[in-house]
Amino acid sequence: MMKMRWLSAAVMLTLYTSSSWAFSIDDVAKQAQSLAGKGYEAPKSNLPSVFRDMKYADYQQIQFNHDKAYWNNLKTPFKLEFYHQGMYFDTPVKINEVTATAVKRIKYSPDYFTFGDVQHDKDTVKDLGFAGFKVLYPINSKDKNDEIVSMLGASYFRVIGAGQVYGLSARGLAIDTALPSGEEFPRFKEFWIERPKPTDKRLTIYALLDSPRATGAYKFVVMPGRDTVVDVQSKIYLRDKVGKLGGAPLTSMFLFGPNQPSPANNYRPELHDSNGLSIHAGNGEWIWRPLNNPKHLAVSSFSMENPQGFGLLQRGRDFSRFEDLDDRYDLRPSAWVTPKGEWGKGSVELVEIPTNDETNDNIVAYWTPDQLPEPGKEMNFKYTITFSRDEDKLHAPDNAWVQQTRRSTGDVKQSNLIRQPDGTIAFVVDFTGAEMKKLPEDTPVTAQTSIGDNGEIVESTVRYNPVTKGWRLVMRVKVKDAKKTTEMRAALVNADQTLSETWSYQLPANE
């Protein structure tokens, strides 16, 4: 068997003809481990100013010529298209094709693109390189290729299934997220994509990650369908110590919703890519954490051992909840991470960042292990990410789940039937579920509730909801210091039987 010999990052990989040769994540890991033992070299931009200084509208004019999609002349159902550099996408990435016998560089050519009104000198871009790539597949119709994967910028990637539109993103790795020292954003600097056979229903992508304090080798197996599933294997190597490492990170956006209504009049009742963090803890507990757009940076940690799963979900898909014909938030997927093997002790961490508009991703969720590897030592993360609009799959089948969280001014009904505000905040939480719908409406359902030191539960009531055939919890809370966050939890029970997941909410400071 011929041994692969890496010449350098700048030299094209040697072609192989041995039938026994096969490319694997170990080949990428050798490069990652070698890089980790060297000083970091920041990527260099070769982008002419006409592209670097362009506005978004100009960048949008640069379109890939669909007739020149990579693998267009092959019978494989997968096709590749590439992103041109421009704006802040100003650093080239290397993209290689892996066949049964060879690895070869996919070279940039301006002929792949149409440039619209963008004036440029062809000689200055002939060796420019790509900013990233996208994968096309006939996911919605047999006679039409639709984009299902986008790899563009840092270590971000977006994935969709049938009938979905792009929303939240996944990332390769998060470093020092929300720490005062500032976040470090690793980037995928090189990709290797296996040429699929005509009958293949999955696509394999390898990636080399690099940053000032970490390197990594990744293998992504994309399995498109009604739910598109990505199987991820990563091998991480630290160059230097980090404050916090985030594995399987997800990035999303939450601007406003019924738990935190828009401060300005808006025809859209809700505006978000995701509205909650769902966690299946190692001890079996299911937790639902509605998202906020806080006035100050907020970080929540859920400590556990060997998590069974977590994800940023878009619960509630009625168009009337969003009313947005352009951006179709009702069609944006949830993303669910299922760990493989035991991840040990650590925390699922949620970061919520203030934002004034929907163009900024302000939500991050990831797994952060208690024990970090020493520089040069390998750390593995293996997991799948499911991109789905079927949230019924993403909670315990025998437990009720939180359908909606609403926040309102707390009040008390007077003898004259007029409601009088009493200085409290009311939370209206609707629980529903297949098993709960089977319960008689006179079932004595009650709530187990708790609140942190900064609040007091003034009243808690549970009543049957005939519309959803579930139960509604109304909890009135008095906050002691509005400048501090207030934590609260609730779950529905019937005697000693737990009926629902745990609703875990943080009321932001200065609300």
Curated annotation (Swiss-Prot):
Domain of life: Bacteria
Residues of the signal peptide: 1-22
GO cellular component: outer membrane-bounded periplasmic space
The UniProt record lists the keyword Transferase: no
Primary location: periplasm
Keyword terms: Periplasm, Signal
One annotated GO biological process: beta-glucan biosynthetic process
GO terms assigned for molecular function: carbohydrate binding; catalytic activity
Record keyword Ribosomal protein present: no
Pathway: Glycan metabolism; osmoregulated periplasmic glucan (OPG) biosynthesis
Pfam families: MdoG
Compartments (UniProt record): Periplasm
Role according to the record: Involved in the biosynthesis of osmoregulated periplasmic glucans (OPGs).
Family: Belongs to the OpgD/OpgG family.
Protein name (record): Glucans biosynthesis protein G
